[in-house]
Swiss-Prot record:
Belongs to the peptidase A8 family. It catalyses: Release of signal peptides from bacterial membrane prolipoproteins. Hydrolyzes -Xaa-Yaa-Zaa-|-(S,diacylglyceryl)Cys-, in which Xaa is hydrophobic (preferably Leu), and Yaa (Ala or Ser) and Zaa (Gly or Ala) have small, neutral side chains. Keywords: Aspartyl protease, Cell membrane, Hydrolase, Membrane, Protease, Transmembrane, Transmembrane helix. This protein specifically catalyzes the removal of signal peptides from prolipoproteins. It is found in: Cell membrane. Its main location: membrane. The gene is lspA. The active site is at 155, 169. GO terms for cellular component: plasma membrane. It is a multi-pass membrane protein. It comes from the Bacteria. This is Lipoprotein signal peptidase. The lineage of its organism: Bacteria, Bacillati, Actinomycetota, Actinomycetes, Kitasatosporales.
Length: 196
């Protein structure tokens, strides 16, 4: 068991003499701790990229598309159309802007708590997507009109016969789908794999 944990990156707490019951040394724990830090760096890198892509796209949409006719991307099947959405992802729950702001803040806190024990690269990517998307929409809710914690999110990706959304929504959905897949495969954020 200790060998499997060493391979997948779960450090054990070493005993006073520098080895744990499975024979791993304090050096093994230090190497594994380094692997964990790299996963946090991966999470933060994915989050920053997702956040900056979302922020940049929204700035461009507000500057170039707001109060303009939609732009056809793939005929009328996919358009770019600027709207302000006070609700959640895909226009759901417009009357609960403050509640969605609180939920997004809670999601960010939970991600940072999970990140402390993160030893799985796929989980780092999934959580990074969630974090970047949550921060992107939270930024809109805090800084855009009509007011702090009540701001409307800028949405612009408009598939035919579907809700309008943005890159933050896409990152959140992709991160959520990846988490479901990882959970079904039995991979935990700490890198352990279990068979049920």
């Amino acid at each position: 068991m200790a060998e499997a944990e060493r391979i997948i990156g779960m450090p054990e707490n070493p005993d006073v003499d520098g080895t744990d019951e499975g024979g791993s040394t304090a050096a093994d724990a230090a190497v594994n701790a380094g692997r964990g830090k790299r996963k946090i760096l991966a999470l933060l890198s994915v989050a920053v990229v997702a956040y900056l892509l979302d922020l940049g796209s929204k700035m461009l949409v507000v500057a170039k598309l707001e109060h303009q006719p939609p732009i056809d991307i793939i005929g009328d099947w996919l358009q770019f159309r600027a709207i302000r959405n006070p609700g959640a992802a895909f226009g759901i729950g417009e009357a609960f802007t403050v509640i969605f702001t609180i939920i997004a803040t809670g999601v960010i806190v939970v991600i940072f708590r999970i990140a402390r024990k993160l030893y799985s690269l796929p989980w780092a990517i999934a959580l990074g997507l969630l974090l970047g998307g949550a921060l992107g929409n939270l930024t809109d809710r805090i800084f855009r009109a009509p007011g702090v914690f009540e701001g409307a999110v800028v949405d612009f990706i408009a598939p035919k016969n579907s809700a309008v959304f943005n890159l933050a929504d896409s990152a959140i959905v992709c991160g959520g789908i990846l988490i479901v897949i990882l959970s079904f495969k039995g991979l935990d954020p700490d890198g352990t794999v279990h068979k049920d």
